[in-house]
Amino acid sequence: MKLVLAIVLILMLLSLSTGAETSDNSASSSATALRDRLLGRKVRTCQGMGESCSSNYDCCGSLCCAGASLFNGCVMGFVAC
């Protein structure tokens, strides 16, 4: 019984001294990197003339989203969208 306890104690000490705990830290840092990438600032790009859109906010500058129901594209607007 004492031999089993001694072996378990030695294995626990070895796992602590060899850096087994650092694997948790690397997992934590990779989870943090993923969170930052997912929640970080999103770069919004706009669509140019003739590119597909779903609303006026998708189009750049004074372009408006217009077209048939199957294909909406950004077009030059002569009046406000």
Curated annotation (Swiss-Prot):
Leader peptide range in chain numbering: 1-19
Entry keywords, A to Z: Cleavage on pair of basic residues, Disulfide bond, Secreted, Signal, Toxin
InterPro entries, alphabetized: Conotoxin (IPR004214)
Removed propeptide positions: 20-42
Subcellular localization(s) per the UniProt record: Secreted
Family assignment from sequence similarity: Belongs to the conotoxin I3 superfamily.
Protein name: Conotoxin Pu11.2
Record organism: Conus pulicarius (Flea-bitten cone)
